[in-house]
Amino acid sequence: MTAPSTSSASSVVPSGADTSPHVAAIHEKILIVDFGSQVTQLIARRVREEGVYSEIVPFQKAEAAFAEMKPKAVILSGGPASVLDDNAPSAPMTILEAGVPVLGICYGEQTLAKQLGGTVEGGHHREFGRAQIEITDDCALFDGIWQKGGKYDVWMSHGDRVTKLPAGFRAVAQAPGSPISVIADDTRKFYAMQFHPEVVHTPDGAKLLSNFVRKVAGLTGDWTMRAFREEAIEKIRAQVGTGKVICGLSGGVDSAVAAVLIHEAIGDQLTCVFVDHGLLRKDEGKSVVDLFRHHYNIPLVHVDVSETFLGALKGVTDPEQKRKTIGKLFIDVFEAEARRVGGADFLAQGTLYPDVIESVSFTGGPSVTIKSHHNVGGLPERMNMKLVEPLRELFKDEVRALGRELGLPDVFVGRHPFPGPGLAIRCPGEITEEKLEILRNADAVYIDQIRKAGLYDVIWQAFAVLLPVRSVGVMGDGRTYDYVVGLRAVTSTDGMTADFYPFEMSFLGATATRIINEVKGVNRVVYDVTSKPPGTIEWE
């Protein structure tokens, strides 16, 4: 359950939205023009890993964003369109004529080449997946990484290809399906590549992006969480003044970091509200209360409404209906508690940068909803409060780094992601207190096993699922007919894609034995070996 997440913070309270300058305003910046690639966020994260602030904007808004941001360099992303289509997306010529370094990736290479007078052809030499390119000439992007004449693995995903160079460019790499795979104009500092350096499947991709950021654009890297902390505190003080702030704590990392940062800025002007809906992991409510009320001395209102939530969920089996029921009820409870606190002028949310950019549509049409996001929705409008969103410029890994900078314990900052609806979506079918207790205990054993094996920080997310089926078993001399527990563990860098974790069979066997022996009501354990895609990380 998370109060602090919203799909589009700027659209929640038009009259009271945060209009103060971004913390990033004083830093070196790179603008990323998004043409609709599924992995554009990875570009931004790779740039941030170099200590440089990056911001993603849709191509339709790129010209205005460039004028406002005054970036030191620009990256053109990939995308699903063809530059040969009528009304194909393009980069504003004002950017290409501004004298700043430009890097084009996949579609970004094609539109850069075409807009500057080159030729792009489509259709006949599609390349998808792993490929090998050969370096035919040196260039600044390759410095210290790739050598002339060498062959290197990359990740391709394209149908069109550049067949004639624009004036001033030279080809510096080739591949079987794209003879002009990397192009360079050293005078204008324009570079472009047909493959995707931002994905892990291009082993040297992060180094190539580093060369563009550091050696081509000449940026020094002044984006650190220590600097962000100091600047964010000043921004919060300027925005809030003497006003009061309430913050919904979920038990997750985002809301916790937001709360500690805001408390450092304004002290007891902040009150946190922790709504325990009865769908949390084992001992989670106690750990949240202990951390904030006793360790940080942050004013905290703890509300136990588990009976109310379980009553509302009785008979509900559809996962979307579960999410919507929990979301609506949370808003009702949080609103009542916030009014009881009284006098709050601001609502704090742990909105992250992906929450802001995920809502952008690049075609003007609707996007497919895979799962509803559980958030506070219209709370600020209903309660006539303004938003404080101190983390809205950060990615998840940056939030964790900020949490450590703020002194939050590693055991808390490094916790695996936990869904807003909690255990409700890890218990397919109808939810009962009995099922939740079985699931809590099984999950606690599983996580304990992972920690003892030293694997917790290696795994992106791990959890148990209580399946809506029973199986026959034999325990002692008797027949059992009990529940089946599914175990899930994945590795990922961002949650957008994920692979199942390849546990040793001995680990799985030992874990299954512990769960069956220690958790009453379970007689069978299975392990989920589905990656994302085709599956999602959570079961519902």
From Swiss-Prot:
Species: Rhodopseudomonas palustris (strain ATCC BAA-98 / CGA009)
Highest taxon of the lineage: Bacteria
Residues engaged in binding ATP: 250-256
Active site: 106, 196, 198
Enzyme class: ligase
Subunit structure, as described in the record: Homodimer.
InterPro entries in UniProt: Class_I_gatase-like, GATASE, GMP_synth_C, GMP_synth_GATase, GMP_synthase, GMPS_ATP_PPase_dom, NAD/GMP_synthase, Rossmann-like_a/b/a_fold
Chain ranges of the Glutamine amidotransferase type-1 domain: 29-222
Descriptive protein name: GMP synthase [glutamine-hydrolyzing]
Enzyme Commission numbers on file: 6.3.5.2
One GO cellular component term: cytosol
